[in-house]
UniProtKB/Swiss-Prot annotation:
Zinc finger (C3H1-type): 48-75, 76-104, 105-130, 131-157
SMART domains cross-referenced by the UniProt entry: ZnF_C3H1
Annotated function: Component of the cleavage factor I (CF I) involved in pre-mRNA 3'-end processing.
Gene3D superfamilies referenced in this protein's UniProt entry, alphabetically: Zinc finger, CCCH-type
The name this protein goes by in its record: mRNA 3'-end-processing protein yth1
Keywords: Metal-binding, mRNA processing, Nucleus, Repeat, RNA-binding, Zinc, Zinc-finger
Organism: Schizosaccharomyces pombe (strain 972 / ATCC 24843) (Fission yeast)
Pfam families in the cross-refs: zf-CCCH
Name of the coding gene: yth1
Length: 170
């Protein structure tokens, strides 16, 4: 009898199960879009091609549809910043640029308190809270041969910086 139950449990078929949030995930996060996208067959989900808006789609002329390697949405969160605009303040592609044009003067700086280890304002802080993977054990012991090129955090324990400021939208 246990073999019968074991066979039924293993042979369960959930391919017809649909959740209410499936369409949301497909539209916003490209989950379940295509097996080719996640299998690495010529398209790496972490590559630049998956984060650049399709120039043909912008004009309504993309013939590839779902098979296109580029984004078919104008989502600012997924677009990488334009290197030329960030460096020079202008881009020769102008409005047709496939990358995000961020104004360097409006960029938010890194929070000095968070870099020291803890920011008392937490999510309402005005600065960026950039995580480093973990403290470098060699640096904590006294010396890290990699210096600033070390992938781990080198915490700076100095006098506290100026008091952190709250975000304007809070």
């Amino acid at each position: 009898m246990t073999d019968y139950i074991k066979d039924k449990a293993i042979a369960a078929d959930f391919s017809s199960v649909q959740f209410r949030f499936d369409n949301y995930l497909k539209q916003n996060f490209n989950f379940g879009r295509s097996a080719l996208l996640n299998s690495g067959n010529g398209r790496d989900s972490g590559s630049k091609m998956g984060s650049v808006v399709c120039k043909h789609w912008l004009r309504g002329l993309c013939k590839k549809g779902e098979q296109c390697d580029f984004l078919h949405e104008y989502n600012l969160k997924k677009m990488p910043p334009c290197h030329f605009y960030a460096e020079r303040g202008w881009c020769s592609n102008g409005e047709e640029c496939l990358y995000l044009h961020l104004d360097p003067s409006k960029q938010v700086g890194v929070c000095a308190w968070y870099n020291m280890g803890f920011c008392p304002l937490g999510p309402i802080c005005r600065g960026k809270h950039v995580r480093k993977p973990r403290p470098c054990p060699k640096y904590l012991a006294g010396f890290c041969p990699l210096g600033p090129n070390c992938p781990d955090a080198h915490p700076k324990h100095s006098e506290p910086p100026h008091p952190p400021q709250k975000r304007k939208d809070w």
